[in-house]
A protein has these predicted regions:
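Structural beta-strand segments of beta-rich domains
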Residues: 20-24
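Low-complexity, Pro/Ser/Thr- and charge-rich linker/hinge segments at domain boundaries
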Residues: 10-17, 84-112
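Short, aromatic- and glycine-rich surface loops/edge beta-strands on solvent-exposed regions
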Residues: 3, 62-75, 81, 178-191
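Single conserved hydrophobic/aromatic residue that forms the stacking wall/gate
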Residues: 1-9
Length: 207
């Protein structure tokens, strides 16, 4: 029988992330999905069916994942090839202030004014990878807000979770239009279980 053309397509790009459930689409033209089999053959994680696709869950950063695809064609199992994917750690997320405007969820990313009313009604911050390719939420473990008094002295306030503390909210109330503060030293953990200190500082400009 003529060898079928094979296809193994990462749903986002040719990279898998360690400790994370990466969706993968695998298909062989002319062969029903139920007759296509795939497995990781070099021991770096697991590959399981999920709906019409697969979920790859690598374990080791820097060690490639090799996926072997076979298909049942004419009652015989044929190899469709091995596919190699690089394995990386999930990138750092960015901190946002998440709010709803006219029923539409929005994320404040800094660099423009934010209504003081929205700020006062927002419980805290979120952290996520939101770059058009990935949309992955992280759990915020803590962060710091930094205000500056009239003498230019930094006044830090620390939160031990994702929510603004009472002291932070009190500082918000005192801010006049055009004043700024900074959200920094955000600690977050992703679905890979890796805790990280984010290098990004979010500048908030109060309208």
């Amino acid at each position: 029988a003529r060898r079928q053309r094979q296809m193994c397509i990462r749903d986002r790009m040719n990279v898998l992330y360690a400790g994370y459930d990466n969706p993968i689409s695998i298909s062989v033209p002319g062969v029903l999905g139920g007759q296509v089999q795939a497995s990781i053959v070099n021991g770096n994680g697991t590959l399981n069916r999920a709906g019409n696709g697969y979920i790859a869950h690598p374990t080791t950063i820097g060690k490639d994942v090799v996926i072997r695809v076979t298909a049942s064609v004419g009652g015989r199992t044929q190899s469709m090839g091995d596919y190699t994917y690089r394995v990386r750690q999930l990138p750092d997320p960015s901190p946002f202030i998440e709010y709803t405007e006219d029923g539409t969820p929005k994320r404040y990313r800094g660099g423009r004014g934010l209504s003081k009313a929205i700020l006062m009604n927002t419980p805290g911050i979120v952290a996520a990878i939101d770059d058009g390719l990935l949309n992955i939420n992280f759990r915020v473990l803590g962060f710091e807000t930094v205000f500056f008094d009239n003498m230019g002295n930094a006044v830090p306030e620390v939160s031990s979770g994702a929510s603004f503390s009472t002291r932070q909210k009190d500082m918000f109330r005192r801010l006049s239009r055009g004043k700024r503060f900074y959200i920094s030293r955000v600690r977050a953990v992703g679905p890979d279980g890796v805790e990280r200190l984010l290098p990004t500082t979010l500048e908030v400009i109060v309208n």
